[in-house]
Amino acid sequence: MVVLSKIFSCALFLSLGSAAAIDIRQTSSINNAFKSHGKKYFGTCGDQNTLSIPQNSAIIKADFGALTPENSMKWDATEPSRGKFNFAGADHLVNYAKQNGKLVRGHTLVWYSQLPAWVKAISDKQTLTSVLKNHITTVMSRYKGQVYAWDVVNEIFEENGSLRNSVFYRVLGEDFVRIAFETARAVDPHAKLYINDYNLDSANYGKTQAMVKHVKKWLAAGIPIDGIGSQSHLSQALSALASTGVSEIAITELDIKGANPSEYVAVTKACLEVKKCIGITVWGVSDKNSWRKDNSPLLFDRNYNPKPAYNAIIAAL
């Protein structure tokens, strides 16, 4: 996750501080308006605790086209003990999405954080390879055909562009990426397979350059990476990611400190300008339930009312 600060200075064509800043939510759902430009979805995240809130659920049904599990598909939730899986939370989200016609983005299969201690303690290559393959196979098999895309590996780069010193890299080296993606492709050949990371906002940033270089190399080696998920919000950076040869990219886990309308509009327009950018996921619905609630970063306030940023996006679309 990354929180965007005040980067953009462009002015909106309507004055959000005036009477013109009316609630135009009823005019069009943000997902429908975004899809009218040829995009696939404008989504959000959730889990059973937030999906069960009536106001929150009503907004998801009306305004968003895709759901990403906030925590329920992470390793500590799905396999807290070796070989003992718990799918209660993930099942709830996937069933909710099916019942309400929403796409699902699976998040996430391989991540250094929210990882059980028993996985972190593995030091043997053969054991970790077996554990990694079994985890990916078991989780993906349960939802085969029900998940549009999976974040197969998540946040594997350091800020300087080196590969993060996770248990996966320490024990398996760079090969853990190949193992993860090849296993995922074998389980569900039709799901889109993503590498996901944050702080890829500048095409010249070391982390962005490392992502581009490595994905090009991995694709050339036949590793089945379909997409890059990023919090990038400038079209130049998104274009750099698209140049790797992946079939699609997506803006993921987006929230903006203070929910500045011009910044949210800039993010939306950046995706519209890059053909391979197929969707945007805002990391939550209401500020009330945001993991950064003190920053008021989302499109709906603590009373579940649309904020100026929501109306600004609709107006821009």
UniProtKB/Swiss-Prot annotation:
GO CC aspect terms: extracellular region
Protein keywords: Carbohydrate metabolism, Disulfide bond, Glycosidase, Hydrolase, Polysaccharide degradation, Secreted, Signal, Xylan degradation
Name the UniProt record assigns to this protein: Probable endo-1,4-beta-xylanase C
Recorded GO MF terms: endo-1,4-beta-xylanase activity
Job of this protein: Endo-1,4-beta-xylanase involved in the hydrolysis of xylan, a major structural heterogeneous polysaccharide found in plant biomass representing the second most abundant polysaccharide in the biosphere, after cellulose.
Highest taxon, organism lineage: Eukaryota
Disulfide bonds: C271-C277
Gene Ontology annotations of biological process type: xylan catabolic process
Species of origin: Aspergillus clavatus (strain ATCC 1007 / CBS 513.65 / DSM 816 / NCTC 3887 / NRRL 1 / QM 1276 / 107)
Alphabetized InterPro entries for the sequence: GH10, GH10_dom, Glycoside_hydrolase_SF
Catalytic function, reaction form: Endohydrolysis of (1->4)-beta-D-xylosidic linkages in xylans
Catalytic residues, chain numbering: E155 (proton donor), E253 (nucleophile)
